[in-house]
């Protein structure tokens, strides 16, 4: 397993051999006093790497502090096979291939989670695709259908459209019959975003983002999905149509890229920059929002895993689309488990496309 003893750089991603009878746990087992009979132990084949894992390593992820503290094993998603199960678990067999979510703990060769957080592996997924699917898919589903609730024909702007969550948002919007404009930060990402369903793609490295956005939907957007933070939040809000909704699920541009750090360590100068960005993050006035008939919504998926009603509803829809080939993971880049530092560094660079996963060396 990978354990982070304290906040810091890549050297804090400490690999530790896990004995055959040991496992990590999803944090909600103890938080919710979930019974032993309702738990499963999964031998993992792969686990997904998300930007939240990087923030956890830096000590900037609030739910990590609230639910676990230090030391912590990061990770929210995995694929593998059922190794053991409680007596109340009747919907899975020993050895059955599954994928699932956890509240931390997924960077491990063996993890114990509640049965409602594990699902049968779809036939059209391999274990790498499955390990990189759930966190981004659930994030996109919640933002799209629980918060934004667009109507067919709505105009939707998706920042970071080539990323894990962004590519899922594009596909969900397409399934729902919306007009999708995707934003990417580099030319090599344009073709991918077109392939997954964007009607228009804005390459902000080659053209003015907001002039292009206005040309595609002069009347504004019914929904804008923004995980950038201070760099784009105000303009995202300003480009909403009346009745529009800005959905925020991250603040990537507030944080340094790997090229700005030394071995993944945030320098004193970068901490000052983070503080400056925090201070200059737009503040949305409720009176102005009411006058302009616009909304701003934000969420953090790790606080939602205990909502079984949402998990069941979202997974039913997501798996329905997966089985019919309407929803795909896209590009998945695997890294050997012990190369977790490289995976973090590459993700921090902002140059990756799709999802990164760590694979076990059985």
Describe every region a protein language model picked out.
Residues 133-207, 211-212:
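Mid-domain Rossmann-like dinucleotide-binding core that forms the NAD(H)/NADP(H) cofactor-binding site
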Residues 30-49, 61-105, 227:
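Glycine-rich beta-strand-centered segment in the early N-terminal region that forms part
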Residues 55, 67-71, 76, 97-162, ...:
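NAD(P)H dinucleotide-binding glycine-rich loop of Rossmann-like/cofactor-binding domains
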Residues 214-223:
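A short acidic, Gly/Pro-enriched loop at the edge of an enzyme's catalytic core
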Residues 231-324, 362:
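Glycine-rich phosphate-binding loop and adjacent beta-alpha segment
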Residues 4, 305-362:
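C-terminal hydrophobic helical "lid"/dimerization subdomain
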